[in-house]
C-alpha cells in the first residue's frame, strides 16, 4: 500500500474517532503542534523514517518529545503509528487530516500569483469573488510573480484561472498566428 493511501486511511480513522469522542478540536491543535516540530526538525523526520531505529525506540522518542505537550488521546495515536511501523507517515497523516478538516469545514486553498503586491482591499475582494464562485471558504496564499507582466493567476486544486497579461498576450499571439494571411 502506498504511503499516501495509508496516510489517508489513518487520517480518516483519527478524524472519525475524534468526532465520535468529541475531541476533534484538541486533536487538531495537537497535530498542529506536532507538524511544527516535524517542520523544524529534519533529524526527527529522518529518525522516524529510519529502518535502523526500532519501533520501541521510535515510540519512546515521540513520547519524550510530545509528553505534556499533546493530549493523551493524541499520544496514543502517534504511539500506535510507531508500533504499526508507520511512524514515517506522521507528517503525511497530519497533512491528510488537515485536508479532511478543510473539506469538512468547506475550506479550499487558493494559490494566487500577481505581478504586483495586491492591496488588502484587492486581496479581500478577490477572495470574496472566489468564494462566491466556488461556494466555499477560501484560504488564499498570495505570492508575487513578476513574469506575469500584470494581472493575476489563481490555482484552486486542478483548476487554473489565468487573468494575467502574459496569458492574454499569448492567446492573442496564437489567434494571430492561426489566422490565414
UniProtKB/Swiss-Prot annotation:
Keywords: ATP synthesis, Cell inner membrane, Cell membrane, CF(1), Hydrogen ion transport, Ion transport, Membrane, Transport. It holds the Pfam family OSCP. It comes from the Bacteria. Gene3D superfamilies: N-terminal domain of the delta subunit of the F1F0-ATP synthase (1.10.520.20). InterPro entries: ATP_synth_OSCP/delta_N_sf, ATPase_OSCP/dsu. It is found in: Cell inner membrane. GO terms for cellular component: plasma membrane; proton-transporting ATP synthase complex. The keyword Transport applies. GO terms for molecular function: proton-transporting ATP synthase activity, rotational mechanism. Its main location: membrane. It is a peripheral membrane protein. HAMAP family: ATP_synth_delta_bact. F-type ATPases have 2 components, F(1) - the catalytic core - and F(0) - the membrane proton channel. F(1) has five subunits: alpha(3), beta(3), gamma(1), delta(1), epsilon(1). F(0) has three main subunits: a(1), b(2) and c(10-14). The alpha and beta chains form an alternating ring which encloses part of the gamma chain. F(1) is attached to F(0) by a central stalk formed by the gamma and epsilon chains, while a peripheral stalk is formed by the delta and b chains. NCBIfam families: ATP_synt_delta (TIGR01145), PRK05758.2-4 (NF004403). Belongs to the ATPase delta chain family. F(1)F(0) ATP synthase produces ATP from ADP in the presence of a proton or sodium gradient. F-type ATPases consist of two structural domains, F(1) containing the extramembraneous catalytic core and F(0) containing the membrane proton channel, linked together by a central stalk and a peripheral stalk. During catalysis, ATP synthesis in the catalytic domain of F(1) is coupled via a rotary mechanism of the central stalk subunits to proton translocation. This is ATP synthase subunit delta. It comes from Chlorobaculum tepidum (strain ATCC 49652 / DSM 12025 / NBRC 103806 / TLS) (Chlorobium tepidum).
